[in-house]
């Protein structure tokens, strides 16, 4: 049976920003209730933050998701180039929020430098241990901020470009986080899973809410988006999406490395999703769980 196992146990879902949340079966009865819990902070900020600050995250995720960093960079670098085209910077302050091992920060910085941009790097994370990992891979970081991205000490428009890679789905207050990003940053690059789709919602109905509960408990996703709702939230926060792409993650799933861990049913489903994504990426994201990568300009 691929129901219940599909996607959730796939290696790509060992995100750099995974976090553990505790919620009862009754509370996770259905998707709409989970959304309500998230919006009302039913999953407490303190509970969420403790997973990072206690060091539990690193103990459970020792690789910090470095295995899929190269794939992520193929989707993120085009957004970095869009930032350069739109802003023509001579120098740039670069913030990585929830950046795991810091490899994406390192490569984005290198890309900017190759384009003639002088870069000043910052890292922000709830975990001091995670920040130390960032420092190991980015010894030239100017400052490491042990803070919550929804409430920072950064000055107004103090950052030119912020990286939010697999982070927004974890925050307890999406609107507050986007508002804070508007305050502190001129541009933001997001990578976000689109988990409010036909496939996930159908499985959740069949499993009586257990799929959404598993998403919370296994990978810490307390927010589920589709692109339309996400775009509306970004626009409401004062952001303008300059460029976006659906990632067609199914192409990655079908790579030789990932296929070693698949059963036949998974390969078949990914092939179907990959075909649909090739024809209509937007439609595919409504049917199956893909990611969107976008760059947002804030004024």
Residue ranges, per PLM feature:
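Active-site acidic short loop of glycosyltransferases
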Residues: 156-159, 173
């Amino acid at each position: 049976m691929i129901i219940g196992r599909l996607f959730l146990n796939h290696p790509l879902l060992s995100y750099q920003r995974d976090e553990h949340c505790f919620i009862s079966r009754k509370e996770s009865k259905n998707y709409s209730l989970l959304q309500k819990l998230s919006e009302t902070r039913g999953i407490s900020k303190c509970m969420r933050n403790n997973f990072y600050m206690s060091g539990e995250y690193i103990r459970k995720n020792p690789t910090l998701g470095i295995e899929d960093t190269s794939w992520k960079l193929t989707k993120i670098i085009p957004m970095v180039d869009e930032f350069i085209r739109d802003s023509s910077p001579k120098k740039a302050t670069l913030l990585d929020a929830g950046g795991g091992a810091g490899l994406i920060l390192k490569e984005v910085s290198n890309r900017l430098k190759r384009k003639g941009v002088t870069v000043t790097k910052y890292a922000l994370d709830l975990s001091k241990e995670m920040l130390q990992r960032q420092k190991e891979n980015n010894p030239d970081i100017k400052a490491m901020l042990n803070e919550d991205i929804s409430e920072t000490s950064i000055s107004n428009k103090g950052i030119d470009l912020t990286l939010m890679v697999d982070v927004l789905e974890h925050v307890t207050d999406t609107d507050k986080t986007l508002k804070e990003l508007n305050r502190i940053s001129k541009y933001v690059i997001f990578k976000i899973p689109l988990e409010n789709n036909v496939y996930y919602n159908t499985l959740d109905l069949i499993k009586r809410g257990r799929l959404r509960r598993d998403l919370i408990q296994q990978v810490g996703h307390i927010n589920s988006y589709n692109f339309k709702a996400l775009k509306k939230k970004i626009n409401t926060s004062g952001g303008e999406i300059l460029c976006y792409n659906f990632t067609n993650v199914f192409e990655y799933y079908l790579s030789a490395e990932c296929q070693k861990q698949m059963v036949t049913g998974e390969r078949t489903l990914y092939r179907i999703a990959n075909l649909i994504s090739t024809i209509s990426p937007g439609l595919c994201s409504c049917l199956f769980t893909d990611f969107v990568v976008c760059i947002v300009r804030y004024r």
